[in-house]
C-alpha cells in the first residue's frame, strides 16, 4: 500500500518536534515544520513526485525533499530514526498533549525526570508541574484537563469523574418528571472504581420508544445537565460531551425495586445467591432472608467474598466515622497549602487530628525535605499544636522506599517522627520478586507505621507493580504495620479486593487522602466507598480512632 500524504506529513512533523526537543539546529527543524505545514495543502500524491518536483513546492528545501523521497520508498528516513532511538517513547505521547510543545516537554523531562503522560498527569495532580519555570497553576490545570480528556477517550472513566455528571443528570430528571424514579444501576450503583458505561433504570415511560426529537424536547426542559447528553437513536445510547456512554431501561413503577436489585448486582453475586426473579420478596432485605443469606450493601454485591466474610452494615466504615486525616503534603514539599492552612481546614471538617507527611529527601522532584527542613517543620508543628489545642498535628513523613528496601533517613531522624508512611516512588518497573523484597524490607523496618499506596498503580493510567498481596498483608500483621487505602480516586490503592484479607488478619487500614491541598481531604469519600466494597470495618480503620486512641496506638508501636 502506497504511503499517503498524511503519513508523510506526520513523519516530517514528528522529526521537527523531536529535533526541537533535543535542541538540534533550529534552522533545520523550523524548515521541516514549515515544509510539513505547506505540504498539508498538497493534494497530489507526494510519493509520486521526484525530488526535483518536490523542490518546486513552497517551503520545501533539499533536506525536506530528500526525507520525503526516502520515506516514500522505505516508510522511514534516517534522520528521524536517529532521533527516535534516543527519545523515550512516552515523550512522543507527551508531545500530543494539548498545550505542550517540544520546549515545554523538554523542560518537564529535564527538570522533573518525567517521560510519560501518566507521570505528567500524576505530577499535575500533585502540583509538581508549577515547580518548572514558566508553568503556573492555570497552565498546570489546562494540561491536567487535556490529559484527562485523552484518557477519557479510551472509554473508561474514574468514578470521581463520572459522579458529578451522573448526580446532576438524575436531579434534572427529577425536576422534569416529578415523582418518577431514576437510579443508575450496574457499576455505578456498586460504586466501582472505574465505570465503563452508565445504565439508568427509570419509571418514566416517556423514555419508551423515545426518538432524538423527543429527547431534545426533554433536554431543553431539563437544562444544561440534560442538554450535555446527546441521544443516538441508531445505537439507542446517550453520549455525554465528556465521552460518557449511557443506556436507559424503562420499567413499570411496581417492578422498579426488583429490577434495581437484579441490575445493580454483579452477575457473580446473583449466582452466589442462586437468585431468580421469582425469589423477590418485595424488598431487598426480605429477599436475602428468604435465601438464608445475610444482607449485603449494594457496593459489596460483586460476587467476590461478600458471603464468605459478611460484614454488618453498621460495622462498615462511613465517612462520618473518620476522626483524623493522615498522609498530607504542604508547601514544605509539593503541596499547595501551608501546615497551618491544612490544620485549620481539617478542624473545620470536624477532624480531631492531622498528620503532615511531606515527601522525604530522596524525592527531589517534589522538594523532598532535607533534615534541616524536617527540624524546621517540627518547630512549626509544635507551635501550632500549642495554638490549636485540643486539635493535634502529628509529625509525619512519606519516606521513599529505596531500591534495597531501606527508608531514606537515618534511624536517628526516623525515630523523631510520630509516624512514617513508607512508599515507593521510583523504579516502578519491578518484577514481583524485586517488589516483594523491597516492600517486605520496608515493612520490617521498625520505623514504618504505614505502607503507602502499596502497588503504585494509577487507575486507567499505570498498572501497579506485581505483588503477592496476601504475603504483604501477612507481613504487616506480623510487624504491626497498617496499610494505606490511598483515597485519591486515581489510585484507590490498596485494591478493595484485598481488604477483606487484611480484616481477617487484623491489619489496620487507613483511609488516606494523600492530599496536596486542603480540598483534597474530600477524596476520603472515594476511599470510604472503596473500603466499603472490600468490607472495611470501622473497628479496623486506623483514622477512625479518636485522638486519644490514635495517640495510644502510636505510643504502643514505639515501645
Each model region followed by its residue ranges:
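Charged catalytic cores and adjacent phosphate/nucleic-acid-binding surfaces used
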Residues: 191-330, 336-356, 361-392, 403-559
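Accessory alpha-helical DNA-binding modules that contact the DNA backbone or grooves
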Residues: 6, 16, 24-198, 202-238, ...
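Non-transmembrane amphipathic alpha-helical segments
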Residues: 12-19
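Short amphipathic alpha-helical heptad-repeat segments
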Residues: 4-12
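Short acidic-aromatic active-site loops that bind/stabilize oxyanions
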Residues: 159, 331-332
Amino acid at each position: 500500500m502506497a504511503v499517503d500524504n498524511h503519513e508523510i506529513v506526520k513523519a516530517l512533523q514528528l522529526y521537527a518536534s523531536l529535533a526541537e526537543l533535543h535542541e538540534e539546529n533550529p534552522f533545520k527543524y523550523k524548515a521541516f515544520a514549515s515544509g510539513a505545514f505547506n505540504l498539508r495543502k498538497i493534494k497530489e500524491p507526494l510519493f509520486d513526485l521526484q525530488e526535483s518536483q518536490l523542490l518546486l513546492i513552497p517551503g520545501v528545501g533539499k533536506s525536506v525533499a530528500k526525507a520525503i523521497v526516502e520515506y516514500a520508498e522505505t516508510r522511514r528516513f534516517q534522520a528521524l530514526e536517529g532521533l527516535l532511538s534516543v527519545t523515550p517513547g512516552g515523550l512522543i505521547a507527551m508531545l500530543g498533549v494539548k498545550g505542550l510543545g517540544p520546549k515545554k516537554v523538554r523542560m518537564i523531562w529535564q527538570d522533573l525526570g518525567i517521560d510519560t503522560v501518566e507521570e505528567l498527569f500524576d505530577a499535575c495532580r500533585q502540583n509538581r508541574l508549577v515547580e518548572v519555570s514558566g508553568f503556573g497553576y492555570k497552565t498546570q490545570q489546562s494540561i491536567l484537563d487535556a490529559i484527562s480528556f485523552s484518557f477519557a477517550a479510551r472509554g473508561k472513566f474514574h468514578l470521581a469523574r463520572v459522579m458529578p455528571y451522573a448526580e446532576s443528570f438524575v436531579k434534572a430528571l427529577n425536576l422534569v418528571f416529578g415523582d418518577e424514579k431514576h437510579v443508575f444501576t450496574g457499576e455505578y450503583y456498586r460504586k466501582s472504581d472505574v465505570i465503563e458505561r452508565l445504565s439508568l433504570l427509570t419509571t418514566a415511560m416517556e423514555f419508551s420508544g423515545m426518538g432524538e426529537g423527543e429527547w431534545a424536547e426533554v433536554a431543553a426542559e431539563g437544562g444544561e445537565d440534560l442538554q450535555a447528553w446527546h441521544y443516538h437513536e441508531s445505537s439507542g445510547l446517550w453520549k455525554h460531551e465528556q465521552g460518557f456512554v449511557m443506556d436507559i431501561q424503562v420499567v413499570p413503577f411496581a417492578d422498579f425495586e426488583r429490577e434495581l436489585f437484579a441490575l445493580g448486582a454483579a452477575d457473580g453475586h446473583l449466582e452466589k445467591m442462586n437468585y431468580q426473579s421469582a425469589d423477590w420478596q418485595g424488598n431487598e432485605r426480605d429477599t436475602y432472608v428468604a435465601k438464608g443469606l445475610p444482607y449485603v450493601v449494594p457496593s459489596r454485591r460483586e460476587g467476590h467474598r461478600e458471603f464468605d466474610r459478611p460484614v454488618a452494615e453498621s460495622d462498615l466504615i462511613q465517612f462520618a466515622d473518620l476522626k483524623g486525616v493522615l498522609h498530607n503534603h504542604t508547601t514544605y514539599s509539593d503541596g499547595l497549602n501551608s501546615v497551618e492552612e491544612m490544620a485549620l481546614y481539617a478542624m473545620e471538617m470536624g477532624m480531631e487530628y492531622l498528620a503532615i507527611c511531606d515527601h522525604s529527601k530522596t524525592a527531589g522532584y517534589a522538594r523532598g525535605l532535607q533534615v534541616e527542613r524536617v527540624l524546621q517543620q517540627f518547630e512549626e508543628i509544635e507551635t501550632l499544636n500549642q495554638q490549636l489545642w485540643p486539635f493535634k498535628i502529628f509529625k509525619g513523613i512519606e519516606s521513599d522506599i529505596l531500591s534495597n528496601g531501606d527508608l531514606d533517613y537515618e534511624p536517628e531522624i526516623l525515630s523523631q517522627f510520630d509516624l512514617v508512611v513508607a512508599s515507593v516512588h521510583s523504579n516502578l518497573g519491578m518484577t514481583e520478586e524485586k517488589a516483594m523484597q523491597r516492600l517486605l524490607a520496608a515493612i520490617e523496618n521498625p520505623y514504618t507505621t504505614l505502607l503507602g499506596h502499596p502497588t503504585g498503580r494509577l487507575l486507567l493510567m499505570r498498572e501497579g507493580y506485581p505483588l503477592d498481596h496476601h504475603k504483604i498483608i501477612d507481613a504487616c500483621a506480623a510487624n504491626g504495620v497498617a496499610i494505606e487505602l490511598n483515597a485519591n480516586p486515581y489510585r484507590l490503592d490498596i485494591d478493595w479486593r484485598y481488604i477483606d484479607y487484611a480484616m481477617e488478619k487484623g491489619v489496620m487500614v487507613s483511609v488516606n487522602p494523600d492530599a496536596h491541598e486542603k480540598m483534597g481531604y474530600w477524596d476520603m469519600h472515594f476511599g470510604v466507598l472503596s473500603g466499603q466494597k472490600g468490607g472495611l470495618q470501622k473497628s479496623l480503620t486506623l483514622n477512625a480512632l479518636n485522638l486519644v486512641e490514635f495517640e495510644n496506638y502510636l505510643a504502643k508501636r514505639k515501645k
